[in-house]
Amino acid sequence: MAGEKMVRDISGVYARLFDHRAVLQAECKYMLREFEGKRNDRELERLRESEQKIRQVQEEIPKCITESVKLKDLLEELKVAREKCHEILVKEEQDLFKERREEIFIESKKNWETFIGEIAEEEKRIEEEFEQSAEKLRARYGVQLVRNPKEPDDKGELQPQEIA
């Protein structure tokens, strides 16, 4: 009996020290009542809002995917348009250079014609001076200078001949 009592006391002490099921159950019931009483409506509203947002996101995802594909196509079209604009700018630039080259060519042609005209005038002046000098020499020495053409177009070299 004494041993039995001792076992009961030990098991009672053991139950109080190590078996907390009753305390935990009471604590759980308290938390549940507290949660349901005070937070039930707020948490339920938050859950409903979250569910609604999730549905909206699920509805928007396919739209976003199709728009993404459209954006890729648009990006490709923009790249093509940019390349065409670049080609047009290059052509315009080349046309400007072409116009400038034509202007330079026309100016050079005018300068060349002016130069050729000046050379022709200088040649005439030199010819006249030569003829005057030849006249003076003929008068002074009695020698006549004549041209001996080697070719029909060539004026040839001057050869002295005595005047008879």
From Swiss-Prot:
GO terms for cellular component: BLOC-1 complex; transport vesicle. Keywords: Coiled coil. Pfam families: Muted (PF14942). The keyword Acetylation does not apply. Residues 36-91 form a coiled coil. Belongs to the BLOC1S5 family. Component of the BLOC-1 complex, a complex that is required for normal biogenesis of lysosome-related organelles (LRO). May play a role in intracellular vesicle trafficking. Component of the biogenesis of lysosome-related organelles complex 1 (BLOC-1). This is Biogenesis of lysosome-related organelles complex 1 subunit 5. It comes from Nematostella vectensis (Starlet sea anemone). The lineage of its organism: Eukaryota, Metazoa, Cnidaria, Anthozoa, Hexacorallia. The gene is bloc1s5.
